[in-house]
Amino acid sequence: MSPSRPGFSCSWLPYLLVLPQLAITAIFFLWPAGEALWYSVQTLDPFGLSSEFVGLSNFIQLFQDEYYLASFYTTLIFSALVAGIGLNVSLFLAAMVDYVLRGSRLYQTLLILPYAVAPAVAAVLWIFLFDPGLGLITHALAKLGYSWNHAQNSGQAMFLVVLASVWKQISYNFLFFLAALQSIPKSLVEAAAIDGAGPVRRFFNLVLPLISPVSFFLLVVNLVYAFFDTFPVIDAATGGGPVQATTTLIYKIYREGFAGLDLSSSAAQSVILMLLVIGLTVIQFRFVERKVRY
């Protein structure tokens, strides 16, 4: 006699339970995405009161705009730097804390603190340190013979926003990496050491494959963070300058949509950014996930 399968007394109850989540998805994702897609094929006046269907004209104009193509390239470079540097530094810090026996709680607390700081505040903090006239780091660099002014030097401006963005995200990555490292059975590491594997070999051949699911998850999260959540950092630190050197796609959407009131162009840029993020996510799940060991 097989046990009875548990179920709901009312056939409509499962749909009622998922209704709030479906409503949130429809209101905050599907509806805005649909409106952006519709506006991207229209020409709207600055107040959105009149429109004219223009098809793919907005997209064609974007890819003929050298400033938009430059922001596209800037976004790719910026995202790769933020995700790559952030993940590697966070993993290194988590590995160091995992090996520390005394005072590990203190190290964990200090490394988690930046996560409580708002992105705009993090940007202001680094601006104070790198201020051309009053910054402590600027004065230290001047004594070494290096002149710093991120308001005039595009490379320095990019360095500043990458540094602030990475510093803000390190705490989030650190928490996941540390939890993954501490979940590895010590017996496996000890067995590898007994077999003659050194610390470096144990880390790359044993530890790194075991935490690959967490690494893959953080890779996706950090790319999304670099594409979207770094907007306050860029806005507070450089305002997209100098000469649009730090203008990413999300910041260009804001500048043209909210500051320039070019709703059609900003909608088309939003659609392109959405497709870009979806494409990168699909590529990661299609190819990168193959190397993940669950």
UniProtKB/Swiss-Prot annotation:
Residue ranges of domain ABC transmembrane type-1 in the record: 72-284
Question: Which is one Pfam family of this protein?
Answer: BPD_transp_1
CDD domains under this entry?
TM_PBP2
* Membrane topology according to the record: Multi-pass membrane protein
**Which InterPro entries does the protein's record reference?**
MetI-like (IPR000515), MetI-like_sf (IPR035906), UgpAE/MalFG_permease (IPR050809)
Task: List the Periplasmic topological domains.
Answer: 33-80, 131-157, 229-262
How is this protein annotated for GO cellular component? Answer: plasma membrane
Q: Which UniProt keywords apply?
A: Cell inner membrane, Cell membrane, Membrane, Transmembrane, Transmembrane helix, Transport
Q: One GO biological process from the UniProt record?
A: transmembrane transport
**Key word Electron transport present in the record?**
no
- Chain ranges sitting on the Cytoplasmic side read 1-11, 102-109, 179-207, 284-294
Could you confirm whether the keyword Cell inner membrane appears in this record? yes
SUPFAM superfamilies reported in the protein's UniProt record: MetI-like
User: What residue intervals traverse the membrane?
Assistant: 12-32, 81-101, 110-130, 158-178, 208-228, 263-283
Q: Where in the cell is it found?
A: Cell inner membrane
Q: How does it assemble?
A: The complex is composed of two ATP-binding proteins (UgpC), two transmembrane proteins (UgpA and UgpE) and a solute-binding protein (UgpB).
Its function, per the record, reads: Part of the ABC transporter complex UgpBAEC involved in sn-glycerol-3-phosphate (G3P) import. Probably responsible for the translocation of the substrate across the membrane.
> What family name appears in the similarity comment?
Belongs to the binding-protein-dependent transport system permease family. UgpAE subfamily.
Q: What name goes with this protein?
A: sn-glycerol-3-phosphate transport system permease protein UgpA
UniProt gene name: ugpA
